[in-house]
Curated annotation (Swiss-Prot):
<dbReference type="InterPro" id="IPR026714">
    <property type="entry name" value="SMAP"/>
</dbReference>
<feature type="compositionally biased region" description="Polar residues">
    <location>
        <begin position="80"/>
        <end position="92"/>
    </location>
</feature>
<dbReference type="Pfam" id="PF15477">
    <property type="entry name" value="SMAP"/>
</dbReference>
<feature type="region of interest" description="Disordered">
    <location>
        <begin position="1"/>
        <end position="160"/>
    </location>
</feature>
<feature type="compositionally biased region" description="Basic and acidic residues">
    <location>
        <begin position="46"/>
        <end position="76"/>
    </location>
</feature>
<dbReference type="InterPro" id="IPR028124">
    <property type="entry name" value="SMAP_dom"/>
</dbReference>
<feature type="compositionally biased region" description="Basic and acidic residues">
    <location>
        <begin position="144"/>
        <end position="160"/>
    </location>
</feature>
<comment type="similarity">
    <text>Belongs to the SMAP family.</text>
</comment>
<feature type="compositionally biased region" description="Basic and acidic residues">
    <location>
        <begin position="112"/>
        <end position="122"/>
    </location>
</feature>
<protein>
    <recommendedName>
        <fullName>Small acidic protein</fullName>
    </recommendedName>
</protein>
Length: 172
C-alpha cells in the first residue's frame, strides 16, 4: 500500500471528467449557426440530412426478373469460363512466366522451348496477333542461339546473359 501512495505522490492525482461538458463539440461557441454546422461537418461530428429515398434490397420497380432460359444460359457461360480457367491453371502454361514477357528457361527446358515456342506462336497467330508474335518469337530465338554460342560457366552467368539479351532485344 505504501508503494501505491508513493507513486501517487510522484505522479499526482488524476482529474475527474469535466462536468460542465467543455469537451462536447455541440457546446463550442463559434458564432452563428452556419459556422457551427460547418465546423461540426469538418470535424466529422455533424449529422447529414438525407436527401431522397433509401431503398435496401431489390424493389419491384428496379429489379429485372430473369426467365429460366436466361438462367440456364448464364450458368452454362459461367461453367465454361470456370472450366477454361481450371484447364489453364492445371496445364501450368502460365506458371513459367515471370512477367513482362520474360520467361526463365532451365537447362532441360531449353531444348523443349524451341518446340513449344513454335506451337505457341501458331496458336497466337490464329488469335489475330501475327506481327507481334512473329517479332517476339524471332527475338526469343535470336537470344537462344546467342546464349548457346556463348556457353557460360555458371548458371548465374547464364541467367544474366539471357536477361541482358532480353533487355537488348526489347530496347531496339
Amino acid at each position: 500500500m505504501s508503494s501505491a501512495r508513493e507513486s501517487q505522490a510522484r505522479h499526482g492525482l488524476k482529474r475527474a471528467a469535466s462536468p460542465d461538458g467543455s469537451g462536447s463539440w455541440q457546446a463550442a461557441d463559434l458564432g452563428n449557426e452556419e459556422r457551427k454546422q460547418k465546423f461540426l461537418r469538418l470535424m466529422g461530428a455533424g449529422k447529414k440530412e438525407h436527401t431522397g429515398r433509401l431503398v435496401i434490397g431489390d424493389h419491384r420497380s428496379t429489379s429485372h426478373f430473369r426467365t429460366g432460359e436466361e438462367d440456364k444460359k448464364m450458368n452454362e457461360e459461367l461453367e465454361s469460363q470456370y472450366q477454361q480457367s481450371m484447364d489453364s491453371t492445371m496445364s501450368g502454361r502460365n506458371r513459367r512466366h515471370c512477367g513482362l514477357g520474360f520467361s526463365e528457361f532451365q537447362e532441360g527446358e531449353e531444348e523443349a522451348a524451341g518446340h513449344s515456342s513454335d506451337h505457341e506462336s501458331s496458336e497466337d497467330s490464329e488469335s489475330g496477333s501475327d506481327s507481334k508474335q512473329d517479332e517476339s518469337a524471332e527475338e526469343l530465338q535470336a537470344a537462344e542461339t546467342h546464349d548457346e554460342a556463348a556457353v557460360p560457366e555458371t548458371k548465374k552467368e547464364a541467367k544474366s546473359n539471357y536477361k541482358m539479351m532480353f533487355v537488348k532485344a526489347s530496347g531496339s
